[in-house]
């Protein structure tokens, strides 16, 4: 069976992302696949490329031919160099590092969540205290009315 490693389109109009799949070369672009070996999302900055290296190595080893876009992705991740035994097997894939801005946003969100939790618990405590006060106020007139009724009789 002639197998290819190619992209399977998903997503919506003007916002496509792809799955890297192994498929029989005679099947449709988005048809039944043999195995999914990765994800490619060109819409993020930098583009998201996740390829299972061991599965890509296996399929390249048994003769699967990558399409041109997948060939470029395999070069970026370093899987093609690893398969061919070339230098640069670490790849040139860029990753997004969590900078101080991201850490500050995370801290702000956690702080906001703690404030909301504290406000919610205070509101619950106030509501409970008001309910107890209202219950005590209702019981007091009822007791006075009960005491006055037998006195008149």
Curated annotation (Swiss-Prot):
GO terms for cellular component: cytoplasm; small ribosomal subunit. This is Small ribosomal subunit protein bS16. Residues 130-153 are annotated as: Disordered. It holds the Pfam family Ribosomal_S16. Residues 140-153 have a biased composition (Acidic residues). GO terms for biological process: translation. Transmembrane segments: none annotated. Keywords: Ribonucleoprotein, Ribosomal protein. The gene is rpsP. PROSITE patterns: RIBOSOMAL_S16. It comes from the Bacteria. GO terms for molecular function: structural constituent of ribosome.
